[in-house]
Amino acid sequence: MINDKLVHFLIQNYDDILRAPLSGQLKDVYSLYISGGYDDEMQKLRNDKDEVLQFEQFWNDLQDIIFATPQSIQFDQNLLVADRPEKIVYLDVFSLKILYNKFHAFYYTLKSSSSSCEEKVSSLTTKPEADSEKDQLLGRLLGVLNWDVNVSNQGLPREQLSNRLQNLLREKPSSFQLAKERAKYTTEVIEYIPICSDYSHASLLSTSVYIVNNKIVSLQWSKISACQENHPGLIECIQSKIHFIPNIKPQTDISLGDCSYLDTCHKLNTCRYIHYLQYIPSCLQERADRETASENKRIRSNVSIPFYTLGNCSAHCIKKALPAQWIRCDVRKFDFRVLGKFSVVIADPAWNIHMNLPYGTCNDIELLGLPLHELQDEGIIFLWVTGRAIELGKESLNNWGYNVINEVSWIKTNQLGRTIVTGRTGHWLNHSKEHLLVGLKGNPKWINKHIDVDLIVSMTRETSRKPDELYGIAERLAGTHARKLEIFGRDHNTRPGWFTIGNQLTGNCIYEMDVERKYQEFMKSKTGTSHTGTKKIDKKQPSKLQQQHQQQYWNNMDMGSGKYYAEAKQNPMNQKHTPFESKQQQKQQFQTLNNLYFAQ
């Protein structure tokens, strides 16, 4: 049976039903129908039955109307409700009036269908001009938005849409998950050997080791076997874990406890505190090396399968990374345009922290004046800062055109794998971490996000040496074959795929021909001036006496008795940094230096 009261309601309120804030939502239309008092029978149902049965009756009445006048009510199917649509998108008022006139003759004056449609479109597209209508619409909208969150409204469409929107915002793109899986299956691992946490094992081993020059030479297995009876599992633990054995010396006072500096102590032979030596059985080390090599071989085979290539070079599977490249230079006076553009830059400036350090430092003005903005059009930069220079580092990044997007903390651990809370780790307070600012320039689409965390837990090494884990983070962000630069680097910072510059490097090594050409032009323009940078070098020919000195010098060079070859023989590290310099090229360089010397 047709519910004529519902038909009358749809005719009288079709404009409000289709427009915001109701927007045709069935359950909101139902609520308006009930609250308007259009149907006494429905009100009776409301008092006697639950809301689900009421809404079912309302839906059945709509179905009866559609059966009587097809296409008079049209819905938009939504996936939130599987069994029925949830939204009315169109009401044919003309057809509904005809239907209502069947029950109440001549109640509505009928117009043409086209005029009815025009009336509907006009009402939907025309904005209310009167202030009262605007206020009414605003009040209805605020009423929809400001519902009581303590009341269970899970059945209302607006609550369902809100939950759906929140879930959609919380959902991470598939690219994040794929990038994380790619990093998991293609990143090579390093060997890991667990550390024994039983202090009694270290005490027993300290009485069974033979130490010479702060090195463990051998173990007395007879004593260890005797201790096995009272300490079951001791031998198995020795063969499967790392042990730190106390290095007891005549001057050691056990009551003082562990040294704050442990293996970094500068007075190791005279310090009265307890120090430790690391013991790893050779069989355990070999087994760990084999397992690591086998795992990395399997991982390298995964790299050859390009199952996800977003953010990587198109030839990632077959392309090999460039060998390590470096230039020894004074960064403050170097022309960064020689290097070109990079995707990732790491900078570890020697901030002036007002302490006696074994290396030179730069003042703030010099660091702020570095033209780092020339190195990237878009990309990411990692800037190491001290506690004093955090705000200065952020200001520098902003001046270079970067936005500070994150801050990574390096949690330092000592020889025993514990966090550092004492020792030479700060000026005013002992620092247990260091700060790394992350800056972003431009809007690079190729960065792989949400792979690593903003914490690095790693052991300290030489003074000012930073953890190697940062290189892995940078390569996973930008890709293995992206151009990467490290500024203020040293010999231990050079690595394949990276370009390193700094004044503590040994020699030069450049594989990129374009950079080599620009560097030669830069050096040529630089050597065309005197050491003061103002006086031009006189290009006159050397005198006869000067030529004799030069000839004698080259003879010594050819015989290998020159100072350069003597030093190179004593320090073979100097030889590996000149792969492009033939003997003739070396002569040309020394010839240039001699000309400069004899011209003065």
Swiss-Prot record:
The keyword Cell membrane does not apply. It catalyses: an adenosine in mRNA + S-adenosyl-L-methionine = an N(6)-methyladenosine in mRNA + S-adenosyl-L-homocysteine + H(+). InterPro entries: MT-A70-like, SAM-dependent_MTases_sf. Induction: In response to starvation conditions. Changing D348A: Impairs ability to sporulate. It is found in: Cytoplasm; Nucleus, Nucleolus. It is an enzyme of class 2 (transferase). Changing W351A: Impairs ability to sporulate. It holds the Pfam family MT-A70. Its EC number is 2.1.1.348. It comes from the Eukaryota. The keyword DNA damage does not apply. Its main location: cytoplasm. One of its GO terms (cellular component) is nucleolus. Disulfide bonds: none annotated. Disruption phenotype: Severely decreases N6-methyladenosine (m6A) levels following meiotic induction. Increases the rate of degradation of KAR4 and MUM2 protein. Keywords: Cytoplasm, Meiosis, Methyltransferase, Nucleus, RNA-binding, S-adenosyl-L-methionine, Sporulation, Transferase. Residues 525-548 are annotated as: Disordered. One of its GO terms (biological process) is negative regulation of pseudohyphal growth. Catalytic component of the MIS complex, a complex that mediates N6-methyladenosine (m6A) methylation of meiotic mRNAs and is required for initiation of meiosis, progression through the meiotic divisions and sporulation. M6A, takes place on the adenosine of 5'-[AG]GAC-3' consensus sites of some mRNAs. Positive regulator for IME2. Belongs to the MT-A70-like family. Component of the MIS (mRNA N6-methyladenosine (m6A) methylation) complex, at least composed of IME4, KAR4, MUM2, SLZ1, and VIR1. Interacts with VIR1. This is N(6)-adenosine-methyltransferase IME4. It comes from Saccharomyces cerevisiae (strain ATCC 204508 / S288c).
